[in-house]
Amino acid sequence: MSTPVSLAQSHSCRVDTHAHVFERGLPLTDSRRYAPGYDATLDTYLQLLNTHDIGRAVLVQPSFLGTDNRYLLQALSQDTHRLRGVAVVAPDASEEALAELHRQGVTGIRLNLIEQSLPDLGAKSWTPLLERLSRLGWHVELHRNAQDLAPMLDRLLEAGLPVVVDHFGRPDPEKGIHDPGFKTLLGYGGTGRVWVKVSGAYRCAVPGSGFVHEATSQLVEHFGAERLMWGSDWPHTQYEQVMNYGQSLSTLLELGLDAAMVDAILCTTPALFYGFEQRTNHAVAKYGQYEGEKRTGQPHDHEVRRCDART
């Protein structure tokens, strides 16, 4: 991995909560659904952030790399001030291994279960991991078709874990907001423990439909803007020909939401959730701040409170 350019050119409060970085030649998991035939490097990604005035970002472990988080951690190490990570781990991941990920800027794990067998999160084999995640103050990011979300959400909430649901909850593109699974997801807005990413709409919407506007309106109604977060889904794997970074950002900015809502979705909520502004959970006492924060202190607290995300 080359040294990325312009690591901290942008001081915007905006946060991109969903992007992937990878290169050809990395070891791939046997259970992969696909593998891109191109590079999506941190260098390229940071240039996009700077171009679009995005100050911070969350790198999500690509599904095709499985539980080998080395490339993700290498990317995070390039700018611990600006980047956070979401890893993929095995159910038997040790407390020591998770603590090391925590120190390197990881804030949660992703369960990418698209086209995968559903795990029994209530099984004894999962209990130790869920308890360890809770002690760290981590969240679980859930990626699954809307119709299958409810049982997993119930178990994760029962374990006391915050949950982030990917890509509008992945309703069936043919059903959109009428997908019963999406309607069920709306009911979790009252828990105060579930967040939804308004991202990757092209994965769950018929082109040209009004899905993004309709779904976002319903999510705001049931969750509040303070439980929604935007992600670019860069590099838009399998949809590279129909989407780019600027279009992804415009999808949110052109919805006609008021300034306070956009500020919550794009700035305030993700800044707090991913620990860019401050880490208030009990994990700090046991494991400390991220390595970068130990050196530099908390970045840009005042900017989170002042920004107008639309500009």
Language-model-detected regions and their locations in the chain:
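Active-site gating/metal-coordination segments in enzymes
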Residues: 66-147, 197, 201-202
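Active-site environment of divalent metal-dependent phosphoester hydrolases
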Residues: 22-25, 64-67, 92-93, 116-117, ...
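Alpha-helical scaffold segments that flank or form the walls of functional sites
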Residues: 31-60, 65-79, 99
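Mid-to-C-terminal alpha-helical segments outside catalytic/metal-binding sites
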Residues: 2-13, 38-56, 218, 224-229, ...
